[in-house]
Amino acid sequence: TVPYMVPTVSFSEYLTDRLKVAVDAGVEAIHVEEPEFWDKSGYSEAFKREYEIYYKEPWKPQHESLDAQYKCARLKAYLYKRTIDRVSAALKEYAKVKYQKDLRFYVPTHSLLNYTQWKIMSPEAELISIPTVDGYIAQIWTGTSREANVYEGVYKERTFETAYLEYGVMQELVKGTGRRMWFLNDPIEDLPSYTWENYEYNYRRTAVASLLHPHIWHYEICPWPHRVFDGRYPRFQPRIAEKIETSFETDQS
């Protein structure tokens, strides 16, 4: 189990020190993936300290009032914004001073639409104000877009419609900024309990939805190929690797 960390100043310093090793090894870009808090979090001692520093008042549990809930959510966004700002600025300076290299810094993140559905707090709206962030990966796939929602009183999965809205929200992060956005295209999702026909059905819908936003033309295709090509998914189709050997390969030309 990987614990969720409160991004304190000391944590940002730890990340910076560890990532300098990657810069020394010659990496050209760093991705800080999914900076996020669960909405129900905010009760650790580290978070309480950050609350009292930020608001200059005693910590209040977020479940006690709407005001406390808002303050905790605002602080969660601030903490990750501060961390990304500090880490990216420090590493870019390190790469420039020591190696005369321009290091790039990207943030892979879900859409705010999905974060709302899954009750996750993200600093996404704040990322545009961090000058050392070079772009984003819109992490939208079947797992986020199949999340059921209500339309005209009917609650059901609407993968294509939801994906279209998610990609549309994400492109706003780079409009007029000169930054780059990649749209994620993943043939499967994290749950291995669906049939391959179901994965393919929904993959086609998310892929088409991503193509309907012409201002974005960079894509991350099949981010976890081992889940597609080594036969682990779905669990109850042991010969799936043979079945999909060429189904989702990209053209070689």
Language-model-derived ranges and their functions:
Residues 1-169:
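Polysaccharide-binding and catalytic clefts of secreted carbohydrate-active enzymes
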